Curated annotation (Swiss-Prot):
UniProt keyword annotation of Lyase present: yes
A GO CC term assigned to this protein in UniProt: nucleus
Record organism: Mus musculus (Mouse)
Family: Belongs to the adenylyl cyclase class-4/guanylyl cyclase family.
UniProt protein name: Atrial natriuretic peptide receptor 2
Residue numbers on the Cytoplasmic membrane side: 479-1047
Gene Ontology BP annotations: activation of meiosis involved in egg activation; axonogenesis; axonogenesis involved in innervation; blood circulation; blood vessel development; blood vessel remodeling; bone development; bone growth
Tissue-specificity statement: Widely expressed. Expressed in the columnar proliferating and prehypertrophic chondrocyte layers of the tibia.
Function, as annotated: Receptor for the C-type natriuretic peptide NPPC/CNP hormone. Has guanylate cyclase activity upon binding of its ligand. May play a role in the regulation of skeletal growth.
Modified residues (Phosphothreonine): 516, 529
Topology of the protein relative to the lipid bilayer: Single-pass type I membrane protein
Domain (Protein kinase): residue spans on this chain: 513-786
Length: 1047
């Protein structure tokens, strides 16, 4: 055979860097060269090997050594070990690929184990290889195997409660590799290991063979497994039809792992294994008989990477090998070889990085055990025996009209669980047959005696049956009457007058503390706003002393048809811990509303969007578990489905139990938003693609749509980034909904951070939001799935509640501490602002809740000043320029007066009023404090510059007077500390009669300053003061630096 020219390389080694002095990696292949009936034939596998090597890069050259294990077109257990010995002797390979046939693989595996050389194959399905003893310790099976098929069959028996017996029929032609024998061997050993009575027989391909087969079936089991060519199955089923074994008492499992019977052929169409080139009568008989047949095949990987790989495989096979391959399950074996080479490269890389060598084959093989990684064939999971976990599909006649076979269930080998597609199996009698019905096999049982009954026994039996029928009829009539009475009583009805509304604080006070996860001080529960991002709150009220949630219905009236009455009755009948309790409904126009149990902790969406709440994974799993329990109960109830599941429809009660709300009562539902509103699309972020298309769905379809909504909520809980979080994308809800509705590959789904999340949780999300509803699990399966990877979920209800309460207490303690710090900071700011408005001593009295009494002061000194020409300056400036000027000036003044024992009373326009000697008395210091402050302000004005008129000089006019005053706080709103008395008026007159850039002081102030003897004053003379007559006044010129007086 002319092999394609390949340079095989392994890039995974040492992170893409070839070790110094390393030799080429040698890959030896022992596979059939010509016989394409084998899925592991070299023309099928060779292109996959080439693709795998190309995918790995060019860090280390690989020598490819291929030899055929065929002898006259068949697998040879004699030739294969000789080829392997030659390869070892002349080429010393690092890895052996193949053989796929069982007997050659056994021989070669013994040599490989002795050489400590890894042997990788995607064939060799026999159960004998599962025990990796000293003979097969280096054998790695990266493809399907018979023991994994047996595990699937045992799981099927457990599902259908078949625990007694089974019968196996198979064809065993020793001229080839005995594929049927080794395939059904896995089923035999698995069922026998489950303590079932399992009988087997080789099918005789000779006249009388079908009769022998049906005789064997009658004597040994109702659950029959058949493994052989499709023609053999046809012969057995035709005979079974003639003997009435297809009446529903038997089920026939056809083990066709590569699904060849479901592919189109010369005489049959795709999915119709019953079609054959027979008479019309026989064809009809086969079609009827095939209703009792279930076909088991490998599962074709659903991931797009495998589809791309298969396309490339077919192209390479045609170009490099001159072979035309068709898309089929046989190509799965090539994909398994591909993933096996990647696995070997990954483990070899790790071994070298840890200091090992490629020659340490046992160490490399041991490191492959228990591996999980994503390959082109999907999730690859290796068990402890280095056998890959295998997925299977169970096919049934899904459409009785056309006779087409469709998937009824998928089996995940990694999870050991069956996922039902929702398509019912067409059992002839409406239910699975019994595997060990009474008197079918154990004829020695005395209860199986069929002696005719006596006349007396017949009369007694008839009388008993009559009484039973009478009793049942009476019960049904009574039940019907009670139902009509209950419908007529309308126990659910609530009058609008019975609902009480009032102050929300009173409701919250009566309902207990509301310093909880939800907001305080509101009688509302959560609902989505028009923008879909923030929460408003649903109305609450009182009904019979209890706080209830009230949802108004946007309808003018409700017609009480029989259907509506049944809906309301069903809502009252449904009671479960994880569903909000339906209390009643008000149908009094215009106040039509639904009244339900109120959950004070808010909605799940509120909790997830509140960053101050710390949710560890124990708490999150608890919320998820509550949601799954509630949905499982709802799906099994008379209501059957939710239809609008979202995180805002999941609420949390005071005991931190999640409950589902807004279910049922389809007649009350209405859409208030316009068809193109933002809020409408925001609510559809949880809606399944099949619902977005607008097509009506059956009940099972609605349940699968709920599963999709659950997946979006699961993503919300896992990431806490809002519904349908998309990393790096900023799309509106409308754009997201349109992309989901389009259903184009790759399907549009939320972002998942696989590095941060549990792999099994991610897998559950992806299954729940699968595009095909039949691929989604039901909530019963989801419950079991979560129970397995949530190890902490097995604690008791009390322990779980205590853990929730402890976590909430810790979170609340942290929240209170943060709020306390925030309060103290705001208190400090408020006090600072208060001290700027009022004197410190006055502010302290107000803080203590005391009334500030007016107080008389015998002697204080008051300062007044204004700007000469300010009116003209204002007229020539804009209002903003005037404000800027005064702000700059008074900021300067305020900074200066902080250095003196004075109190700033007020500023009015350009007027500035300051006092010393109150509210804290300072003896005789008030006059010199004001004097020094006035001198400082006058000096500051000389260097002050106006921004918009930098060349102009401000002219400050100052007046000072000393005398008695009365002071106190005036007003309740915006209180002010005001001064009263003639001294205030006199000080104002001193300022208004003064001159620019001079300090005008009264004689009383001059007397107070003279006591110090350090201030320079100049007599101005007698000045006529309005309302005062003539007063002798002085100019304050400065202060002499010398020995202090009083100060």
């Amino acid at each position: 055979m002319a092999l394609p020219s390949l340079l095989l390389v392994v890039a995974a080694l040492a992170g893409g860097v070839r070790p110094p002095g390393a030799r080429n990696l040698t890959l030896a292949v022992v596979l059939p060269e010509h016989n394409l009936s084998y899925a592991w034939a070299w023309p099928r596998v060779g292109p996959a090997v080439a693709l795998a090597v190309e995918a790995l890069g060019r860090a280390l050259p690989v020598d490819l050594r291929f030899v055929s294990s065929e002898l006259d077109g068949a697998c040879s257990e004699y030739l294969a070990p000789l080829r392997a010995v030659d390869l070892k002797l002349y080429h010393d390979p690092d890895l052996l690929l193949g053989p796929g046939c069982v007997y050659p693989a056994a021989s070669v595996a013994r040599f490989a184990s002795h050489w400590r050389l890894p042997l990788l194959t995607a064939g060799a399905v026999a159960s004998g290889f599962a025990a990796k003893n000293e003979h097969y310790r280096t054998l790695v099976r990266t493809g399907p195997s018979a023991p994994k098929l047996g595990e699937f069959v045992v799981t099927l028996h457990g599902h259908f409660n078949w625990t007694a017996r089974a019968a196996l029929l198979y064809l065993d032609a020793r001229t080839d590799d005995r594929p049927h024998y080794f395939t059904i061997e896995g089923v035999f050993e698995a069922l026998q290991g489950s303590n079932l009575s399992v009988q087997h027989q080789v099918y005789a391909r000779e006249p009388g063979g079908p009769e022998q087969a049906t005789h064997f079936i009658r004597a040994n089991g109702r659950i029959v497994y058949i493994c052989g060519p499709l023609e053999m199955l046809h012969e057995i089923l035709l005979q079974a039809q003639r003997e009435n074994l297809t009446n529903g008492d038997y089920v026939f499992f056809y083990l066709d792992v590569f699904g060849e019977s479901l592919r189109a052929g010369p005489t049959r169409a795709t999915g119709r294994p019953w079609q054959d080139n027979r008479t019309q009568e026989q064809a009809q008989a086969l079609r009827e008989a095939f209703q009792t047949v279930l076909v088991i095949t490998y599962r074709e990987p659903p991931n797009p990477e495998y589809q791309e790989f298969q396309n490339r495989l077919l192209i390479r096979a045609r170009e490099d090998f001159g072979v035309e391959l068709a898309p089929s399950l046989m190509n799965l074996i090539a994909g398994c070889f591909y993933d096996g080479i990647l696995l070997y490269a990954q483990v070899l890389n790790e071994t070298i990085q840890e200091g090992g060598t490629r020659e340490d084959g046992l160490r490399i093989v041991e490191k492959m055990q228990g591996r999980r990684y994503h390959g082109v064939t999907g999730l690859v999971v290796m068990d402890k025996n280095n056998d890959r976990e295998t997925d299977f599909v169970l096919w049934a006649m899904g459409d009785l009209d056309s006779g087409d076979f469709q998937p009824a269930a998928h089996y995940s080998g990694a999870e050991k669980q069956i996922w039902w597609t929702g398509r019912p199996i067409p059992w002839v009698k409406g239910a699975p047959p019994l595997d060990n019905p009474p008197c079918a096999f154990d004829l020695d049982d005395p209860s199986c005696d069929k002696t005719p009954l006596s006349t007396l026994a017949i009369v007694a039996l008839g009388t008993g049956v009559t009484f039973i029928m009478f009793g049942v009829s009476s019960f049904l009539i009574f039940r019907k009457l009670m139902l009509e009475k209950e419908l007529a009583s309308m126990l659910w009805r609530i009058r609008w007058e019975e609902l009480q509304f009032g102050n929300s604080d009173r409701y919250h006070k009566g309902a207990g503390s509301r310093l909880t996860l939800s907001l305080r001080g509101s009688s509302y529960g959560s609902l989505m706003t028009a923008h879909g991002k923030y929460q408003i709150f649903a109305n609450t009220g009182h009904f019979k002393g209890n706080v209830v949630a009230i949802k108004h219905v946007n309808k003018k009236r409700i017609e009480l048809t029989r259907q509506v009455l049944f809906e309301l009755k069903h809502m009252r009948d449904v009671q479960f811990n994880h569903l909000t309790r339906f209390i009643g409904a008000c149908i009094d126009p215009p106040n039509i509303c639904i009244v339900t149990e109120y959950c004070p902790r808010g909605s799940l969406q509120d909790i997830l969007e509140n960053d101050s709440i710390n949710l560890d994974w124990m708490f999150r799993y608890s919320l998820i578990n509550d949601l799954v329990k509630g949905m499982a109960f709802l799906h099994n109830s008379i209501i059957s489905s939710h239809g609008s599941l979202k995180s805002s429809n999941c609420v949390v009660d005071s005991r931190f139990v999640l409950k589902i709300t807004d279910y049922g009562l389809a007649s009350f539902r209405s859409t208030a938003e316009p068809d193109d509103s933002h809020a409408l699309y925001a609510k559809k972020l949880w809606t399944a693609p099949e619902l977005l298309s607008g097509n009506p769905l059956p009940t099972t379809g609605m349940q699968k749509a709920d599963v999709y909504s659950f997946a979006i909520i699961l993503q919300e809980i896992a990431l806490r980034s809002g519904p349908f979080y998309l990393e790096g994308l900023d799309l509106s809800p409308k754009e997201i909904v349109q992309k989901v509705r389009n259903g184009q590959r790759p399907y549009f789904r939320p972002s998942i951070d696989r590095t941060q999340l549990n792999e099994e949780l991610v897998l559950l999300m992806e299954r729940c939001w699968a595009q095909d509803p039949t691929e989604r699990p039901d909530f019963g399966q989801i419950k079991g799935f979560i129970r397995r990877f949530n190890k902490e979920g097995g604690t008791s209800i009390l322990d779980n509640l205590l853990l929730r309460m402890e976590q909430y207490a810790n979170n609340l303690e942290k929240l209170v501490e943060e709020r306390t710090q925030a309060y103290l900071e705001e208190k400090r700011k408020a006090e600072a602002l208060l001290y700027q408005i009022l004197p410190h001593s006055v502010a302290e009295q107000l803080k203590r809740g005391e009334t500030v009494q007016a107080e008389a002061f015998d002697s204080v000194t008051i300062y007044f000043s204004d700007i000469v020409g300010f009116t003209a300056l204002s007229a020539e400036s804009t209002p903003m320029q005037v404000v800027t000027l005064l702000n700059d000036l008074y900021t300067c003044f305020d900074a200066i007066i902080d250095n003196f024992d004075v109190y700033k009373v007020e500023t009015i326009g350009d007027a500035y009023m300051v006092v010393s000697g109150l509210p804290g008395r300072n003896g005789q210091r008030h006059a010199p404090e004001i004097a020094r402050m006035a001198l400082a302000l006058l000096d500051a004005v000389s260097s002050f510059r106006i921004r918009h008129r930098p060349h102009d000089q401000l002219r400050l006019r100052i007046g000072v007077h000393t005398g008695p005053v009365c002071a106190g706080v005036v007003g309740l709103k915006m209180p002010r500390y005001c001064l009263f008395g003639d001294t205030v008026n006199t000080a104002s007159r001193m300022e208004s009669n003064g001159q620019a850039l001079k300090i005008h002081v009264s004689s009383t102030t001059k007397d107070a300053l003279d006591e110090l003897g350090c201030f320079q004053l100049e007599l101005r003379g007698d000045v006529e003061m309005k309302g005062k007559g003539k007063m002798r006044t002085y100019w304050l010129l400065g202060e002499q630096k010398g020995p202090p007086g009083l100060l």
